[in-house]
């Protein structure tokens, strides 16, 4: 449980901080540098809008679910696992979509190691593991 909590925090916290920069100053160079790469520009208005929508969704849905779920899990409550499963589902779904959607743009710039680990892989891994673990705990299986 604690390993998954820590892995989730290490994975999600930098993303949420980067998105906060973007939400507070969406047209700033700092936001572009953090989210799409130093000196890079948005490919088009759809790229900008989808990034902004995902940032809002993460702050309005993913963060509250993950945070409340983590508190519930730390307290040993079943509702914590239910909220965590919801957060994990969001992380898994969004990042599987982005894994394929952004590959042609992101992969050449950052390389295989970063792309398949931190950039997308860890979000998919945490989402999958947290979803399975939460389901097992809700079913009554303890570790």
What kind of feature is each model-predicted range?
Residues 1-143:
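Topology signature of small-to-medium multi-pass alpha-helical membrane proteins
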């Amino acid at each position: 449980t604690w390993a998954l909590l820590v892995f989730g925090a290490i994975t999600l916290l930098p993303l949420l901080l980067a998105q906060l920069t973007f939400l507070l100053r969406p047209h700033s160079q700092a936001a572009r540098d953090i989210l799409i790469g130093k000196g890079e520009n948005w490919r088009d208005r759809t790229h900008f809008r989808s990034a902004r929508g995902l940032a809002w969704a993460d702050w309005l849905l993913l963060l509250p679910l993950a945070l409340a779920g983590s508190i519930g899990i730390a307290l040993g409550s079943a509702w914590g696992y239910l909220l965590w499963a919801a957060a994990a589902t969001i992380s898994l779904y969004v990042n599987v979509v982005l894994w394929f959607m952004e590959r042609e743009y992101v992969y050449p710039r950052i390389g295989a190691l970063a792309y398949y680990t931190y950039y997308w892989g860890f979000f998919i891994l945490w989402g999958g593991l947290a979803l399975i673990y939460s389901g097992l705990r809700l079913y009554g299986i303890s570790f």
